[in-house]
Amino acid sequence: QQSRIHCTRLAGQKADNWWLRQSPQVMGLQFVDGLGRADRDNAIDVYMGDEYEDVLRDGEWQKRFKVKPEVFTAEEKKAWLAGNQNVTLGSDAFFPFFDNIERAHKSGVKYIAQPGGSVRDSDVIACCDKYDMVMAFTGIRLFHH
């Protein structure tokens, strides 16, 4: 079973990837005619990732794109991700430590709904206050063991 921070990290990475897909660099990609949806999605994932050269090297980009895309630099990604704000995060269980809030903040989270009930709720609240986040305790855990 994944820990709560692993779940928060994964959710943050998914939100970041979704937001990167909305960037002008990705939205402006010109795919070759007839390229299937799965191939487009895979090309986008590789293009946004650290191994972007796999789809940009000569002999490869021509299979996917009409025009060779410019590299989507780490600086450009960071700048674009900074614009992702007012994200909402919901959790089916309480956050046991403030590190979950720290990670959520990196992905633009501003609003959190969670059951509450951790012995460290005060630490979690303090971290939310530090980033001017709004957190609501629902009082309801949404899973069974």
Question: What are the functions of these language-model segments?
Answer:
Residues 2-145:
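Feature captures the catalytic cores and cofactor-binding loops of soluble hydro-lyases/lyases
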